[in-house]
Amino acid sequence: MGMARFAEFLGWANQFDIPVVTAWVLSKENLSRPPNELDPYFEVLIELFDRLPGLCEDYDTAIKFIGSLDLLPDDLVSAAKSAEEAHPGGSRRLNIAMGYGGRQEIVDAAKDLVAELVEKGFSGDELVSQINSDALAAHMYSAEVPDPDLLIRTSGESRLSGFLLWQSAYAEFVFVDVNWPAFRHVDFLRALRDFAGRSRRFGQ
């Protein structure tokens, strides 16, 4: 049911010409769950990823997976990469966060930035002086797309649980009481209406 809703959601986003959608299908913390919970879910994800290229072709949407894919089973990673390679370009973008943790993303970005600076010959205070928010942002998993404007959290939870910690600094949040499989078109429309009625200040 949740995967069917995922396909529907892509259609809803397409109707409103939303250029970037990021969906969190599996957190890094989820990976600590027992195999009898994870294995069936992995199978569902593989089935979804097999369908994704067709869906994304219909909506002219590029696919990119973000997260610690090295922690995931080989067959799941293979299905993800096949989907990504099948539709790498498009006027819209679908990010799928899998094995994802917001803190880990920031750590990975910091490591990548420092490694890049060292390779360029920087060290000591000179290296430190090169580290700033713009430089770090350029090394986030989805650095090539804008930060999100709206984050929709389902399941009645009022927390981010580590989702897009860096990118969501100025995003607007909408918390929805229903679980994801029960998320309806009307819930989506209400979230957009709520967002449209807000006055965004971007921290000012």
Regions found by a protein language model. Name each.
Residues 1-204:
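Flexible, compositionally biased loop and terminal segments
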